[in-house]
């Protein structure tokens, strides 16, 4: 499960997982993340190529060394394997937000690894 601010846990559902035959040490995973109002992730990395598609609400994403971006339904975001995700939060304190993430990662590697700043 993705970690969020205490009391505001993100709900994560695995939608799909597959071993990638052309890349024996890799796997593909698809997850749906639901942020309750005001939820915010801890600083983390994915050690994966992560492709984000926003389904509902608005989220703020920021990678270390880059500007924060606000995304709404229908917009996308990318995180590379070496990126540190310093901001991931629901922009709204009253409405939920949902997004899908497709991860191309090492087989058996965790979906998320917390990073201390």
Q: How should each PLM-predicted stretch be described?
A:
Residues 24-25, 45, 53, 70, ...:
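Extracellular/periplasmic catalytic domains that process cell-envelope and extracellular macromolecules
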Residues 25-30, 49, 66, 82, ...:
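Extracytoplasmic
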Residues 68, 83-109:
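Ligand-binding loop in jelly-roll beta-barrel domains
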């Amino acid at each position: 499960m993705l970690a969020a601010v205490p009391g505001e846990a993100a709900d994560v559902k695995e939608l799909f997982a597959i071993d990638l035959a052309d890349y024996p040490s890799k796997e593909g995973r698809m997850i749906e993340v639901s942020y309750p109002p005001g939820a915010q992730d801890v600083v983390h990395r994915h050690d994966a190529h992560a492709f984000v598609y926003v389904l509902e609400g608005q989220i703020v994403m920021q990678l270390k060394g880059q500007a924060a971006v606000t995304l709404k339904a229908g917009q996308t975001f990318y995180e590379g394997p070496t990126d540190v995700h310093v901001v991931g939060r629901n922009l709204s304190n009253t409405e939920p937000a949902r997004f899908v993430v497709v991860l191309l990662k090492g087989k058996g590697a965790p979906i998320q690894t917390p990073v201390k700043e």
